[in-house]
Amino acid sequence: MKYNRNALYINVLPFARYFRQRFAPLSATGGGRKATTTELHKQKTVYTNRVRRLAVRSDNMKTDRVITAMIEYFGSDKKRIHHFLKVYSFAKTIGESENLLPDDQELLEISAIVHDIGIKVSEEKYNSSAGKYQELEGPHEAEKLLAALGYEKTFIDKVCYLVGHHHTYGNIDTLPYRILVEADFLVNLYEDDSSRSAAEQAYDKIFRTNTGKNLLKIMFLIP
């Protein structure tokens, strides 16, 4: 967790207290009856599921803040807003299907939300949305936005690296990087109304994860 780390722990404490209070009498060898294995397992499952729901809720609340900030950043530019939301959705799906570690999943999702943040400045300064300008201008804009939301510098630096390289395909060396590129391709191929031939080229040259390749095959009817 790279944002509001203490919030989850604070919310979990009541359940931790409940867990201890609930099991103390059951497992006591004195006045209370001894719990059966089935009872203990059932109660532990309830407790674990509650903690997991809290963790998911905490992550979603954090992601929502970044999404809202990006929508405010793009304002009435509905095309850019819809684009980053689609890339985020694909990236999240691929990352979860590929069983990314939690820190990598968080890095992937936040990077997907802000990956095109440099496009606004690029169009203003260079009258172009070319990838090279996005990579040039994006990291600084991403740093400002994430710092304002309270993210740690080490995490921001990792996001900025992906933002500054998401149109560079020659040296993809991490799974978050790979999945971000694949998610962006899935959306761009659709938005550009690309042919199946173009999708097949991307399949051969870009896509490496099983989930990403499968999604591309389904969407573009690749045999």
Sequence positions of predicted segments:
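An active-site-proximal "capping" alpha-helix that borders the catalytic cofactor pocket
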Residues: 87, 132-148
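Short, Lys/Arg-enriched N-terminal segments with co-localized hydrophobic residues
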Residues: 42-60
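Active-site flanking loop/helix segments enriched in acidic
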Residues: 63-86, 118-128
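Divalent metal-dependent phosphate-bond-processing catalytic cores, especially two-metal-ion Mg2+/Mn2+ enzymes
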Residues: 72-101, 114, 151, 166-223
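His-Asp-centered metal-binding catalytic motifs of divalent-metal-dependent phosphohydrolases/nucleases
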Residues: 105-124, 138, 160-167
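Short hydrophobic alpha-helical segments enriched in small aliphatic residues
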Residues: 7-12, 16, 24, 28, ...
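Short Gly/Ser/Thr- and charged-rich N-terminal loops/segments
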Residues: 20-34, 53-55
